[in-house]
């Protein structure tokens, strides 16, 4: 088994040392027989391998030459179309092994066509049959079959039954089509629209084969063949140029250039919302608001129950409560800030009263002062106030001057008359001048009594008798 597995490896890939070194058995042992004298332990020295081609004498060279001759004879019997000559070719220049034309029916599937066990099952062909294909012209080839190679010819497999490959210009995304001006962004989409409309209306452009296209595009165009009304397709094109057929069917065309067109580029920048905003009815909103007043945070069982009652989903109720709590929190913070600002505005006005309060307090104060003054005046009727006292003083001063003058005149006139008349004049003048209150009269008398002695020297300075000076004092 080991020799059978390594024999094709050495024979096909390297051909430097033959597989005969693995075993000396015959054809039944999956190898070929050699001369016992030539059987030797293989030498892996590069010098021996190089000298083997030159043909120097020696046991190693003889063994390698014998092995090459045996390998040539063996491969020549198996492959009649290939000529192996040991003298002309060196083991350093391996000859390619060509697979046979026909495979036997009893050939196991796991064996390689180049293995030794595979070559043992092949029948020996007579030499007359080997030369017959060379003399007679070859028969016409069958579709899908491999032809046996001839000597000196190169095997070129080709499929005669397949359709001819479409040209690069006919393909939708061929090299010539891509490099042409149709993919220039400055060029309009007239050619693309013309090709698509011709395909959609049932007619195909010349040279385009659906079999040559990819299966996805072929199935797409084959399904659109029954459509024959071009007006239904071209009507949105005239109204909205961006709504083109290429924009509608951009995913159906294969290739990386399907999404790099001018119309499809802005489409990538637009963000599509994967969800739509839920619109609640008035009944649902009232039910949610009533539950929110009772309970700001709902548990999962309560949320499911509320959603079932209102005809909503669990996610909708959850999101509504989250948004409602956020709104409630913001309103609460705004109210607290408003109250704080109001308190801060009232604090500086608390120490100093406002103008309105000052005006309100001033009349009350004046009224209180008036009441107190009236009460004082009522309780002290006989006692004059400060103003009355000052007025009385001024009046007394004025009256004293008059009295002085009158007294002086009286005294002057009294100098020749009797003392009684002068006393009566002075008393009458004093009584006539005192028409005010009793306090003013008393103050007048006191003032007169105080002021008369000051004028006494002026009165008495003249040549008067001492009796005249004593008369007003005794009377007053």
UniProtKB/Swiss-Prot annotation:
Entry protein name: H2.0-like homeobox protein
Return the Basic and acidic residues bias intervals.
331-346, 355-368, 386-397
Q: Which domain of life is it from?
A: Eukaryota
Annotated region (Disordered), positions in chain:
121-170, 328-401, 413-476
Q: Which family does it belong to?
A: Belongs to the H2.0 homeobox family.
Task: Enumerate composition-biased segments (Low complexity).
Answer: 158-168, 413-446
* One GO cellular component term: nucleus
Gene symbol here is: Hlx
Q: Does the keyword Transcription apply?
A: yes
- Which Pfam families does its entry note? Homeodomain (PF00046)
Species this chain originates from: Rattus norvegicus
Tell me if NADP is a UniProt keyword of this record: no
